[in-house]
Each structure stands twice: as C-alpha cells, then as structure tokens.
C-alpha cells in the first residue's frame, strides 16, 4: 500500500509540475492577435492537428504515438524556456538546456513511466522515425497558421526574412510534402507579397513554380 501511495504521489508531482507549461509564452500570437499563445496551447493545437491531418503524412504513422510526442515535447521549456525560432544565440545552447530539463522533469515520474517519456522526447529530437518527422511538420506549420491568421504580426514584429523561414522549415516536407507545399504556396507567398515577410531570397519573383523552389529547402542536402 505504501509503495502504491508513493507511486501516486510521484505521478501527481509530475502532473502539478507540468502545469507550469501554461506559463511559458511563445512569440506566436493567437489567431485573433489578442495575446501570445503559451506552450500548453501550442501542444494541444498540434495534437488536434495530428488527429485531423495524419492522412497527409508521407509515411504511415502511429497517430496516438505522434499525439503523445507532441503533447510532451515542449515540457522541457518549463526549465529551459522557449527558444524563439530565429534566435541564433539561444539555439546554440538549446539542446544542452533541454536535455538537462528533460532528465529532471521526466525523472519526477516512476522510472517505468518517466523513461519511456524521455525516450519519446529524444525520438522527436532525433527526427529518425515517421512519427517524429510528422510531429516536426506539425510543430513548424502550427505557428505558421497562427501567423497567417493574425496578419503576420509576429513576423512583422521580428522583421523575419524568408531565408530564415525556409531555413527553419527545410525538413518540414519530410513529414508531409502536401502540407508544406500548401503552406509555401498559400501562406508564405501571400505574406511575402504583402510585406509581412522580407523576401531576401527572391523566390517568388522567379517565373519557376514555387514548389520547385521549396524543394531546395526540404532535402537532407540542405543541411
């Protein structure tokens, strides 16, 4: 009975700890531009997206596993903080900070629960499985959808260049070519033309099809 109580207390400690994810605010605004979203909202949104959009994955995926991966992958930011997509200095120390955070936070759980969650987070980071690749697609597309809905507000505030977006999204098509192709042609193009994204690449001024250009940023050779 005592062991069962200790197990439950560890689980509840973890559950209380991850409530802090609601206090980690991202740079992306909500669709109505009223405020910035938090990590918990981001995770929930991507989980629903995966349930609805998994049919567009390049490879067959385990939807439940992918949903779980997305729900837990940003928990590390409770300790490590949110690293803005285009913060190069922050990204230099991001992995080290997040690895340490993952070990502490998932370590709050009983070992047989904490270790699988740590492994699931590491699988997402490694990007070697169909689930991890599709999860990355969701992680990159979700803020793009909100930026689109909010009139490109975050892009304008940070003077984001197209080269930065393409660099960040060079692996997005590895999870879903169809979703990336849609986003490239229907979201990025629109916001470049409206001036919300600085077109330092000249991609959309060329007569060649946009998809031909976007493929330059989605292959392993782009690393």
Model-derived features with residue positions:
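Histidine/acidic-rich helix-loop-helix segments that form or flank divalent-metal centers
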Residues: 10, 111-152, 164
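Active-site flanking loop/helix segments enriched in acidic
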Residues: 17-42, 85
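Alpha-helical phosphate/pyrophosphate-handling elements in metalloenzyme active cores
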Residues: 34-64
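Short active-site segment of divalent metal-dependent hydrolases/proteases
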Residues: 76-77, 142
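Divalent-cation-assisted or electrostatically stabilized phosphate/pyrophosphate-binding catalytic cores
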Residues: 90-104, 158-172
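Conserved small/polar residues in nucleotide/adenosyl-binding loops
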Residues: 217-223
């Amino acid at each position: 009975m005592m062991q069962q109580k200790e197990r439950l207390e560890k689980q509840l400690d973890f559950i209380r700890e991850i409530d802090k994810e609601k206090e980690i605010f991202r740079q992306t605004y909500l669709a109505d531009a009223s405020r910035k979203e938090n990590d918990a909202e981001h995770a929930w949104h991507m989980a629903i997206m995966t349930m609805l959009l998994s049919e567009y994955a390049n490879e067959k995926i385990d939807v439940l596993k992918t949903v779980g991966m997305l729900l837990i992958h940003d928990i590390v930011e409770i300790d490590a903080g949110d690293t803005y997509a285009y913060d190069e200095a922050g990204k230099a120390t991001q992995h080290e900070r997040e690895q340490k955070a993952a070990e502490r936070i998932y370590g709050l759980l009983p070992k047989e629960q904490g270790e699988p969650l740590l492994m699931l987070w590491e699988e997402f980071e490694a990007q070697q499985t169909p689930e991890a690749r599709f999860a990355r697609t969701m992680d990159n597309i979700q803020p793009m959808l909100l930026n689109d809905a909010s009139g490109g507000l975050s892009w304008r505030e940070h003077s984001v260049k197209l080269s930065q977006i393409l660099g960040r999204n060079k692996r997005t098509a590895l999870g879903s070519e169809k979703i990336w192709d849609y986003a490239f042609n229907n979201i990025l193009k629109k916001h470049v033309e409206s001036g919300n994204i600085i077109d330092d690449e000249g991609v959309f001024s060329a007569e060649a099809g946009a998809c031909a250009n976007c493929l330059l940023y989605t292959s392993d050779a782009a690393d």
